[in-house]
């Protein structure tokens, strides 16, 4: 996994530079997400390894329907370098670069049950205050947490779940 990220990083930076130059962060995000989803399918991944598949066919397969010429050239570059399989990693790294440039912290809040809009607003405000930047929050539900929530920003994890508290209590009693 780390090798894939290492290989994907220069391509993500190149994609980001092209998007920044054209002021088209969102269209590139959408295009990369589409291509990453298609390339991540096991059947497509197997097809991409087929030597009979020509570069232009691979680009057509992976490009979104209304892809711009710059994006198609980018996919062609990846095809030339035999790096199309790295599209999921490239898309993830691109999103990290975009979030940094837009001064946005991406956070995932996983709770035991669905959160109310008021709870989500409180958490978002607290994260915004802590990081001093805008916060883009996505939510998930994991009933195994029992109660509370786990907040993951990539840089740090705040575990306020009952499951986590019980695990920490068990660990402290065991030692």
From Swiss-Prot:
The lineage of its organism: Bacteria, Pseudomonadati, Pseudomonadota, Gammaproteobacteria, Lysobacterales. It comes from Xanthomonas campestris pv. campestris (strain ATCC 33913 / DSM 3586 / NCPPB 528 / LMG 568 / P 25). F(1)F(0) ATP synthase produces ATP from ADP in the presence of a proton or sodium gradient. F-type ATPases consist of two structural domains, F(1) containing the extramembraneous catalytic core and F(0) containing the membrane proton channel, linked together by a central stalk and a peripheral stalk. During catalysis, ATP synthesis in the catalytic domain of F(1) is coupled via a rotary mechanism of the central stalk subunits to proton translocation. It holds the Pfam family OSCP. GO terms for biological process: proton motive force-driven ATP synthesis. It comes from the Bacteria. This is ATP synthase subunit delta. F-type ATPases have 2 components, F(1) - the catalytic core - and F(0) - the membrane proton channel. F(1) has five subunits: alpha(3), beta(3), gamma(1), delta(1), epsilon(1). F(0) has three main subunits: a(1), b(2) and c(10-14). The alpha and beta chains form an alternating ring which encloses part of the gamma chain. F(1) is attached to F(0) by a central stalk formed by the gamma and epsilon chains, while a peripheral stalk is formed by the delta and b chains. It is found in: Cell inner membrane. Keywords: ATP synthesis, Cell inner membrane, Cell membrane, CF(1), Hydrogen ion transport, Ion transport, Membrane, Transport. GO terms for molecular function: proton-transporting ATP synthase activity, rotational mechanism. GO terms for cellular component: plasma membrane; proton-transporting ATP synthase complex. The gene is atpH. Belongs to the ATPase delta chain family. It is a peripheral membrane protein.
């Amino acid at each position: 996994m780390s090798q894939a990220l290492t290989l994907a990083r220069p391509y993500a930076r190149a994609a980001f530079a092209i998007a920044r130059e054209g002021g088209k962060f969102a269209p590139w995000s959408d295009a990369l997400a589409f291509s990453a989803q298609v390339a991540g399918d096991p059947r497509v991944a197997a097809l991409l390894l087929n030597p009979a598949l020509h570069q232009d066919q691979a680009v057509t397969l992976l490009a979104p329907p209304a892809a711009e010429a710059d994006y198609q050239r980018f996919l062609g570059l990846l095809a030339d370098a035999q790096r199309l399989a790295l599209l999921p990693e490239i898309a993830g790294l691109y999103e990290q670069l975009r979030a940094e440039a837009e001064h946005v912290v991406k956070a995932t809040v996983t709770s035991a049950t669905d959160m109310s809009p008021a709870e989500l607003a409180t958490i978002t405000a607290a994260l915004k205050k802590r990081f001093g930047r805008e916060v883009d929050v996505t939510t998930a539900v994991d009933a195994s947490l029992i109660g509370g929530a786990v907040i993951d920003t990539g840089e740090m994890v705040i575990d306020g779940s009952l499951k986590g508290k019980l695990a920490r209590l068990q660990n402290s009693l065991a030692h």
